[in-house]
Amino acid sequence: MEGAGSRGAGPARRQGARGLGLLLLLWLLPGLAAPQDLNPRGRNVCRTPGSQVLTCCAGWRQLGDECGIAVCEGNSTCSENEVCVRPGECRCRHGYFGANCDTKCPRQFWGPDCKERCSCHPHGQCEDVTGQCTCHARRWGARCEHACQCQHGTCHPRSGACRCEPGWWGAQCASACYCSATSRCDPQTGACLCHVGWWGRSCNNQCACNSSPCEQQSGRCQCRERMFGARCDRYCQCSHGRCHPVDGTCACDPGYRGKYCREPCPAGFYGPGCRRRCGQCKGQQPCTVVEGRCLTCEPGWNGTKCDQPCATGFYGEGCGHRCPPCRDGHACNHVTGKCTHCNAGWIGDRCETKCSNGTYGEDCAFVCSDCGSGHCDFQSGRCLCSPGVHGPHCNVTCPAGLHGVDCAQACSCHEESCDPVTGACHLETNQRKGVMGAGALLTLLLGLLLSLLGCCCACRGKDSARRELTLGRKKAPQRFCGSFSRISMKLPRIPLRRQKLPKVVVAHHDLDNTLNCSFLDPPSGLEQPSPSWSSRASFSSFDTTDEGPVYCVPHEEATADSRDLEATAALTEVAAVSLEPTGTSTPGEEAAVLPASSDSERSASSVEGPSGALYARVARREARPARTRNEAGGLSLSPSPERRKPPPPDPATKPKVSWIHGKHSAAAAAPSPPPAGRKAAPSPSGRKRTPSNSSVQPPGLTEEAPGPASPTPPRARARGRGLGLSEPTDAGGPPRSAPEAASMLAAELRDKTRSLGRAEKPPPPQKAKRSVLPAATVRTASASEASGSEKAAASAPAPETPRKKTPIQKPPRKKSREAAGEPSRAGTAPGAS
């Protein structure tokens, strides 16, 4: 135990002596090492009073940037086995204890003052500072707890593996080796390993390789460096390479080439045999011949060898620039930043420019073909035709009936002939003239209508005293309306074919005027497809189309307001009224004067004639009550309410077009000479006038025109009775007042007008021919007190030849029979009563 302690004390003393020598060197030679600045926050660092100089505090010495070495000086100097831990304080080293620190720790203890117990005792010894175990012979393990099993060797202190002594092999070194002196035994396998220069199984053959080793099994020479040949007797001449061991060819090192590897790689190449190319080194600088490294790279490249392009979206020096966006999402060039690829039809740094100058495709590398009246598509090169043409080269005009882009739209013209570009309809010469004439006509008509409105508005502002004037002075507005209607009939006819004209509607109402005048233009060409229309059809007051009749009737309010005034005026004239003399005009005369207005009136359609006669009579009866009473003085109408407003006709027998055709029209159109065998005057168009074509003349103009006295045609008187009008007779009876007669006729007119829109089939024409006989009989009975000449005229039937020319006259004959029946019954009623 003591021997062991003395052996352990020697190394400790030597370690302490080395520590003291180090401290002495640091003390004596402080200037050998450059002093390091102290850290103001380091351990034991103080400032000199009165200055900012940093220094170690008292009792401490600098170590690095702080003061970590304690100084024990003077009487406090530490002994050999002591360590200064604080200024003037010493402690025993690890492994020693005692008052003077001169006693070594026992084997089972270690550490400061020998306070730590050793865990590897008693098969080992702990190190004084760390406590690590050092096992005794034949022991191994972390705490020396395992016994060594090697028979002819030692155990590894950590793993326990056997280390066999020479001549022994195996896991526990229990097998002996049988090798010659020129070999050694393998401790794992027991095989003999020949020494250098010997070969064979027993290593008893010497190598003949010129001092070079040979293979142990075959004896083949393994030449040393820079030697080659079968016996390694030839010298290698490769400067920067290795020789082949058999033929001596050189295998050059990286960066050299040539037969003897004496030529360095040219610029831009590196590697074995200079077969690899350098990357994009900046300025054509050579790369390292061995590894191919570049100092700096060209713009757009990076990597140690400058062989990698910039990442997507970056370009330029060091790949530090971000690419601007390219059209259609393409990436830019990693060197220049420009777009690398553009879609077909686009070029430019950002693919923002279309192909021009007749080019198309990728990079605008293709030339467009001739596209005629079109242009080339900058992407595909296909011809895009302008409106009106088509075809692969845009040189074919659109066929008839088509227009627009690629001739894909159909023309809307009736003749299917339109402009191939715009689709506008072509107008022929006569059509253009028709449109121009229609425009001029509309302008003229608008001017006339405005004049009429101004006149009517001026008449409305008259004071109440003007209303009390005689009925003769009130005829001016009525005459003006009739004149305007006749002027419109005289306007020329303009063929418009299928062209449409705007519709003009002007309505006028004048409280002073007892007529309510309305003017409507005819339906459009599509609604009424007639080749032409006249002003008569346009502004006739007796239109009976599907859009409704256009007429002039006494206004109800105006009639009611003026009824008292007219009744008073009528009473003053009744006393002087008697049978009309030969020289005065009669209702038959009025009917004869009406058709003689103009040729243009006779050329109007046969639909408006009969109805126009009735409307004209209604207007005259309202405007001239005194004269009407004078003419109707011979009749005595029943004062019963049902006679004032007769019931409407039976819808089953009502004609489709008008309820006042036939004999009334014939009588209105008949001139003053005897009607037998007489024909109507021809119209300007060359057509013969029929009773249905008779026109109506405004009452104002008819009254002003004087004419010779003529007997009233009996058919006209019969028709007047059929319509509810009073006619002069020889028998004097109480005359009906003009307002009452006008009200009755207006009510009957409204009832008849409402039934015009109903589309019933008219009765057969054969039944209408027999309607004359009852009317003639009733007319003879009711006119028994008339003069002899008037009775003869009433009993004589009117000629039927003109009425047979137009089929439209036949339905009204039945209506005339029904209308004539009611007045006849009304005429007999007073006699019966």
UniProtKB/Swiss-Prot annotation:
<keyword id="KW-0675">Receptor</keyword>
<feature type="compositionally biased region" description="Low complexity">
    <location>
        <begin position="781"/>
        <end position="798"/>
    </location>
</feature>
<dbReference type="InterPro" id="IPR002049">
    <property type="entry name" value="LE_dom"/>
</dbReference>
<feature type="disulfide bond">
    <location>
        <begin position="368"/>
        <end position="376"/>
    </location>
</feature>
<feature type="domain" description="EGF-like 3">
    <location>
        <begin position="140"/>
        <end position="174"/>
    </location>
</feature>
<keyword id="KW-0472">Membrane</keyword>
<feature type="modified residue" description="Phosphoserine">
    <location>
        <position position="600"/>
    </location>
</feature>
<dbReference type="GO" id="GO:0016020">
    <property type="term" value="C:membrane"/>
</dbReference>
<feature type="domain" description="EGF-like 5">
    <location>
        <begin position="205"/>
        <end position="233"/>
    </location>
</feature>
<feature type="signal peptide">
    <location>
        <begin position="1"/>
        <end position="33"/>
    </location>
</feature>
<feature type="domain" description="EGF-like 6">
    <location>
        <begin position="228"/>
        <end position="262"/>
    </location>
</feature>
<feature type="disulfide bond">
    <location>
        <begin position="118"/>
        <end position="126"/>
    </location>
</feature>
<feature type="modified residue" description="Phosphoserine">
    <location>
        <position position="638"/>
    </location>
</feature>
<feature type="disulfide bond">
    <location>
        <begin position="236"/>
        <end position="243"/>
    </location>
</feature>
<feature type="compositionally biased region" description="Basic and acidic residues">
    <location>
        <begin position="748"/>
        <end position="761"/>
    </location>
</feature>
<feature type="domain" description="EGF-like 7">
    <location>
        <begin position="364"/>
        <end position="395"/>
    </location>
</feature>
<keyword id="KW-0245">EGF-like domain</keyword>
<feature type="glycosylation site" description="N-linked (GlcNAc...) asparagine">
    <location>
        <position position="75"/>
    </location>
</feature>
<keyword id="KW-1015">Disulfide bond</keyword>
<keyword id="KW-0325">Glycoprotein</keyword>
<dbReference type="GO" id="GO:0007157">
    <property type="term" value="P:heterophilic cell-cell adhesion via plasma membrane cell adhesion molecules"/>
</dbReference>
<feature type="disulfide bond">
    <location>
        <begin position="135"/>
        <end position="144"/>
    </location>
</feature>
<feature type="disulfide bond">
    <location>
        <begin position="209"/>
        <end position="221"/>
    </location>
</feature>
<feature type="disulfide bond">
    <location>
        <begin position="164"/>
        <end position="173"/>
    </location>
</feature>
<feature type="disulfide bond">
    <location>
        <begin position="67"/>
        <end position="78"/>
    </location>
</feature>
<feature type="disulfide bond">
    <location>
        <begin position="179"/>
        <end position="192"/>
    </location>
</feature>
<feature type="disulfide bond">
    <location>
        <begin position="194"/>
        <end position="203"/>
    </location>
</feature>
<keyword id="KW-0597">Phosphoprotein</keyword>
<feature type="compositionally biased region" description="Basic and acidic residues">
    <location>
        <begin position="619"/>
        <end position="630"/>
    </location>
</feature>
<keyword id="KW-1133">Transmembrane helix</keyword>
<keyword id="KW-0677">Repeat</keyword>
<feature type="glycosylation site" description="N-linked (GlcNAc...) asparagine">
    <location>
        <position position="395"/>
    </location>
</feature>
<feature type="disulfide bond">
    <location>
        <begin position="148"/>
        <end position="155"/>
    </location>
</feature>
<feature type="domain" description="EGF-like 1">
    <location>
        <begin position="63"/>
        <end position="102"/>
    </location>
</feature>
<keyword id="KW-0130">Cell adhesion</keyword>
<comment type="subunit">
    <text>Homophilic and heterophilic interaction via its extracellular domain. Interacts with SCARF1. The heterophilic interaction with SCARF1, which is stronger than the homophilic interaction with itself, is suppressed by the presence of SCARF1 ligand such as Ac-LDL.</text>
</comment>
<feature type="modified residue" description="Phosphothreonine">
    <location>
        <position position="712"/>
    </location>
</feature>
<dbReference type="InterPro" id="IPR042635">
    <property type="entry name" value="MEGF10/SREC1/2-like"/>
</dbReference>
<feature type="modified residue" description="Phosphotyrosine">
    <location>
        <position position="615"/>
    </location>
</feature>
<feature type="disulfide bond">
    <location>
        <begin position="223"/>
        <end position="232"/>
    </location>
</feature>
<feature type="disulfide bond">
    <location>
        <begin position="385"/>
        <end position="394"/>
    </location>
</feature>
<feature type="glycosylation site" description="N-linked (GlcNAc...) asparagine">
    <location>
        <position position="302"/>
    </location>
</feature>
